[in-house]
């Protein structure tokens, strides 16, 4: 895992966009974002059970698995959104990026690799993108998992 401030430069979302300003796991924790590294799925299962999770799904984000829907799905995952419940994301292989909003409204990018697990708190704005490889991402959720609209859309409604 590597966390840093997103550079906000234009270009492919699947590139690192590393500003060079590192963010510690302690700073992530202050945002409510928790990081773990579990090489054993039994440890993931135990954490999920301890936190009251009952449901899970897995999605493989790749052109081979998604076919013609791939580009649209990658763009959809990168739309800023939040959930009413906490969620766990565990990377079984490959690499992906989670961007989470900091308290001062900037993006913090968290690069996750195989066996990395991230817990996102309820109500945090976030988005996800793969790198250019195929990434299976099990999503472990407590109950229903509905994405609420992004900040720009929510502001427009109010």
Swiss-Prot record:
Which N-terminal residues, if any, form the signal peptide?
Answer: none
**Protein's cellular compartments:** Cytoplasm; Nucleus
The record lists Fe(2+) as bound by 81, 83, 87, 126
Q: Which reaction does it catalyse?
A: 1,2-dihydroxy-5-(methylsulfanyl)pent-1-en-3-one + O2 = 4-methylsulfanyl-2-oxobutanoate + formate + 2 H(+); 1,2-dihydroxy-5-(methylsulfanyl)pent-1-en-3-one + O2 = 3-(methylsulfanyl)propanoate + CO + formate + 2 H(+)
Pathway membership = Amino-acid biosynthesis; L-methionine biosynthesis via salvage pathway; L-methionine from S-methyl-5-thio-alpha-D-ribose 1-phosphate: step 5/6
Establish whether keyword Nucleotide-binding is in the entry: no
Q: Does the keyword Secreted apply?
A: no
Query: What are its cofactors?
Result: Fe(2+); Ni(2+)
Function as written in the Swiss-Prot or TrEMBL entry? Catalyzes 2 different reactions between oxygen and the acireductone 1,2-dihydroxy-3-keto-5-methylthiopentene (DHK-MTPene) depending upon the metal bound in the active site. Fe-containing acireductone dioxygenase (Fe-ARD) produces formate and 2-keto-4-methylthiobutyrate (KMTB), the alpha-ketoacid precursor of methionine in the methionine recycle pathway. Ni-containing acireductone dioxygenase (Ni-ARD) produces methylthiopropionate, carbon monoxide and formate, and does not lie on the methionine recycle pathway.
Q: What is this protein called?
A: Acireductone dioxygenase
Gene source species: Metarhizium robertsii (strain ARSEF 23 / ATCC MYA-3075) (Metarhizium anisopliae (strain ARSEF 23))
Q: What is the lineage of its organism?
A: Eukaryota, Fungi, Dikarya, Ascomycota, Pezizomycotina
